[in-house]
Swiss-Prot record:
Positions MEP for the nucleophilic attack (site feature) positions: R157, K213
Pfam family name, one: IspD
One Gene Ontology biological process: isopentenyl diphosphate biosynthetic process, methylerythritol 4-phosphate pathway
UniProt similarity note: Belongs to the IspD/TarI cytidylyltransferase family. IspD subfamily.
EC category name: transferase
Associated pathway: Isoprenoid biosynthesis; isopentenyl diphosphate biosynthesis via DXP pathway; isopentenyl diphosphate from 1-deoxy-D-xylulose 5-phosphate: step 2/6
SUBUNIT field: Homodimer.
This protein's encoding gene: ispD
MF annotations from Gene Ontology: 2-C-methyl-D-erythritol 4-phosphate cytidylyltransferase activity
HAMAP family: IspD
Protein name: 2-C-methyl-D-erythritol 4-phosphate cytidylyltransferase
EC assignment: 2.7.7.60
Recorded catalytic activity of this chain's protein: 2-C-methyl-D-erythritol 4-phosphate + CTP + H(+) = 4-CDP-2-C-methyl-D-erythritol + diphosphate
Taxonomic source organism: Salmonella heidelberg (strain SL476)
Amino acid sequence: MAATLLDVCAVVPAAGFGRRMQTECPKQYLSIGNKTILEHSVHALLAHPRVTRVVIAISPGDHRFAQLPLANHPQITVVDGGNERADSVLAGLQAVAKAQWVLVHDAARPCLHQDDLARLLTISENSRVGGILASPVRDTMKRGEPGKNAIAHTVERADLWHALTPQFFPRELLHDCLTRALNEGATITDEASALEYCGFHPALVEGRADNIKVTRPEDLALAEFYLTRTIHQEKA
């Protein structure tokens, strides 16, 4: 029988540096308003009553996290992350070994809306596999010729989606799929790809396209705009 309305834990891999931001500070510690990007991302998870614990995987040499109010939050657990995202997620899963369902959310994705999170969490009512937030591709997509800055052909976009986070899976299933994929040398770009590698087909839950990941310098201003707009809407 599928689980229903269970408390869930979340894992936030935050051990990366994000060199495309062209800053000396890891992007998750850049500020938007009076909070870091990491704080915005984590608080969006904790705002939902079903999310009872968040495990944050940080770099072993990270000295910034201890300076944040999150470091003393009663619902936050910190673990050492690994060299790759999948290693950090596995470390987080080890810390919530008794959890049945787990969210995984990008540390640098601060604009998560509560209605999107709520719809994603309903998956646990009737699924044994889980699913992800995703946004349908709207732009025309081109595949490039290998090694050249030239178009090979246009890619049909009808069934293409941008993968977002959070991604939501049974904890044991995600752990087993990540472990197998890593052991077999598979390329894992997100948690869903580990399940795909093992033959599962997670659900696509349409989410808002403004749930962006801060990756490049120009994303910071865009995320600030989205967050400010959301705050104003909530106060209205």
